Amino acid sequence: MSMQDPIADMLTRIRNGQSANKVAVTMPSSKLKLAIANVLKEEGYIEEFKIEGDTKPELELTLKYFQGKAVVESIQRVSRPGLRIYKRKDELPKVMAGLGIAVVSTSKGVMTDRAARQAGLGGEIICYVA
């Protein structure tokens, strides 16, 4: 059976991995998942990510902890296959009054809400991370 929402699966694997204090989580790889992982790494929510395997590439995310506590407090899917959520540049949300990030898919690639606002771009709100 095929997966209905691979991004929600990725976010759930991160959430479950951190609640179980796992060092790393693996999942099937895709271009969008790589772009989201890159944003999470740049913002300091994960240590690193790498791709393993040739025929079926797997994405491995090394999770990040601070003083034994998970860095990602909450990670929530916003736009989903059944209900896409798009926002203009002036409508982009601030997560936890600017302490968290919204991951946005724009015409110039996947970026944070802050970067999209600076670039003057709107797009699809993929998820909130705090």
From Swiss-Prot:
One of the primary rRNA binding proteins, it binds directly to 16S rRNA central domain where it helps coordinate assembly of the platform of the 30S subunit. One of its GO terms (molecular function) is structural constituent of ribosome. Coiled coil: none annotated. This is Small ribosomal subunit protein uS8. Keywords: Ribonucleoprotein, Ribosomal protein, RNA-binding, rRNA-binding. InterPro entries: Ribosomal_uS8 (IPR000630), Ribosomal_uS8_CS (IPR047863), Ribosomal_uS8_sf (IPR035987). Pfam families: Ribosomal_S8. Belongs to the universal ribosomal protein uS8 family. GO terms for biological process: translation. GO terms for cellular component: ribonucleoprotein complex; ribosome. It comes from the Bacteria. NCBIfam families: PRK00136.1. Part of the 30S ribosomal subunit. Contacts proteins S5 and S12. Disulfide bonds: none annotated.
